[in-house]
Curated annotation (Swiss-Prot):
Post-translational note: Highly phosphorylated on serine residues. Phosphorylation on Ser-310 is enhanced on erythroid differentiation. Phosphorylation on Ser-142 promotes sumoylation on Lys-137.
Tissue: Erythrocytes. Expressed (at protein level) in liver.
Keyword set includes Transcription: yes
Region ranges (Required for interaction with ZFPM1): 203-222
Subcellular localization, as worded in the UniProt entry: Nucleus
Compositionally biased spans, kind Basic residues: 305-318
Effect of S26A: Loss of phosphorylation of the chymotryptic peptide
Protein name, per record: Erythroid transcription factor
Subunit structure and binding partners: May form homodimers or heterodimers with other isoforms. Interacts (via the N-terminal zinc finger) with ZFPM1. Interacts with GFI1B. Interacts with PIAS4; the interaction enhances sumoylation and represses the transactivational activity in a sumoylation-independent manner. Interacts with LMCD1. Interacts with CREBBP; the interaction stimulates acetylation and transcriptional activity in vivo. Interacts with BRD3. Interacts with MED1, CCAR1 and CALCOCO1. Interacts with EP300. Interacts with CEBPE.
Gene3D superfamilies: Erythroid Transcription Factor GATA-1, subunit A
Domain remarks: The two fingers are functionally distinct and cooperate to achieve specific, stable DNA binding. The first finger is necessary only for full specificity and stability of binding, whereas the second one is required for binding.
């Protein structure tokens, strides 16, 4: 497939669309320097003038490189595309390769060798990265990470127009217009200026409280504190603001007097057999003894009951348990209590181990009381002989058969 304008790349003459009249000399001027083609360059390099020979040698080297590049199967197409006026962002490509002017003009032409600009870019990028890392170390614990945008350089020295490309919008590719470095976001008070909904100043309509673990609402939608809301939910009415007084220990009734001791203060009013009111002390005394309480037992103060839990019951209970344990396990022996076994062996601690003869008592001294409830035929055998036994094997004698719960008397050594 043939592309228009690409066939001329294989020739040694400059392309018409790449030729600038101000940069390319006329054929008459160029004949004095070198003729067209490498033959002319070779002839010029053999000149007697040292300056002319040096210039001709450099031009010949560049000409051969350009010829090798243009005759290679790979073509550089982007200068041709940039030179087309119909493409957006295209710019005329000045062909400095065919003229006697300087290789690096001051126009917007892209130089062929970008070693110096790339080195400058790398140096500036390295400095920028170092500054950015220093800022990261400085504000590592800072909650406002958006202030890092101020560490970016103010502007980049190279723009898109220097390479013939279209310029991108600055808010996306310019550090000054990026969101990180904008004044609105890099301010230390950025978080405080966010459009958050202000916290409403709530107040309980019943008690006026402004702080509560949980805000509730009444039937009309007004705010209630947690206490008032729970009270209203349980009782269906507002919580009283005045706390109720403590329950009076002494019960006073206007005009009420004990018919036995004539006292007017008591913790509980009672009635006697005839229905007359009596104090608590006289009423209890009459209930227990069926006689009136003597007046000599009257006291001015009211004796209250000490309702604190005492540890006497616990001590008694512990002593009872200790006595029972001593009865079950006398010194020098032990008892085995076992229920009925499906195998018919009572007092069997393990498979192949029976406690029925007095001759084997020395094997089980020092074990203490052992209580086994329920069938014991499922127990696993002991892993080995008991410590302290003079023999190396367990007795396997026959055990007495029984079907009811039995207690073996303590064995004597």
């Amino acid at each position: 497939m043939d592309f228009p304008g690409l066939g001329a790349l294989g020739t040694s003459e400059p392309l018409p669309q790449f030729v600038d009249s101000a940069l390319v000399s006329s054929p008459s001027d160029s004949t004095g320097f070198f003729s067209s083609g490498p033959e002319g360059l070779d002839a010029a390099s053999s000149s007697t003038s040292p300056n002319a020979a040096t210039a001709a040698a450099s031009a010949l080297a560049y000409y051969r490189e350009a010829e090798a590049y243009r005759h290679s199967p790979v073509f550089q197409v982007y200068p041709l595309l940039n030179s087309m006026e119909g493409i957006p962002g295209g710019s005329p490509y000045a062909s400095w390769a065919y003229g006697k002017t300087a290789l690096y003009p001051a126009s917007t032409v892209c130089p062929s060798h970008e070693d110096a600009p790339s080195q400058a870019l790398e140096d500036q990028e390295g400095k920028s990265n170092n500054t950015f890392l220093d800022t990261l170390k400085t504000e590592r614990l800072s909650p406002d990470l958006l202030t890092l945008g101020t560490a970016l350089p103010a502007s980049l020295p190279v723009t898109g127009s220097a390479y013939g490309g279209a310029d991108f919008p600055s808010p996306f590719f310019s550090p000054t217009g990026s969101p990180l470095s904008s004044a609105a976001y890099s301010s230390p008070k950025f978080h405080g200026s966010l459009p958050l909904a202000p916290c409403e100043a709530r107040e309980c309509v019943n008690c006026g409280a402004t702080a509560t673990p949980l805000w509730r609402r009444d039937r009309t939608g007004h705010y209630l504190c947690n206490a008032c809301g729970l009270y209203h939910k349980m009782n269906g009415q507002n919580r009283p603001l005045i706390r109720p007084k403590k329950r009076m220990i002494v019960s006073k009734r206007a005009g009420t007097q004990c018919t036995n001791c004539q006292t007017t203060t008591t913790t509980l009013w009672r009635r006697n057999a005839s229905g007359d009111p009596v104090c608590n002390a006289c009423g209890l005394y009459f209930k227990l003894h069926q006689v009136n309480r003597p007046l000599t037992m009257r006291k001015d103060g009211i004796q209250t009951r000490n309702r604190k839990a005492s540890g006497k019951g616990k001590k008694k209970r512990g002593s009872n348990l200790a006595g029972a344990g001593a009865a079950e396990g006398p010194a020098g022996g032990f008892m085995v209590v076992a229920g009925s076994s499906s195998s018919g062996n009572c007092g069997e601690v393990a498979s192949g181990l029976a406690l029925g003869t007095a001759g084997t008592a020395h094997l089980y001294q020092g074990l203490g009381p052992v209580v086994l409830s329920g069938p014991v035929s499922h127990l696993m055998p002991f892993p080995g002989p008991l410590l302290g036994s003079p023999t190396t094997s367990f007795p396997t004698g026959p055990a007495p058969t029984t079907s009811s719960t039995s207690v073996i008397a303590p064995l004597s050594s």
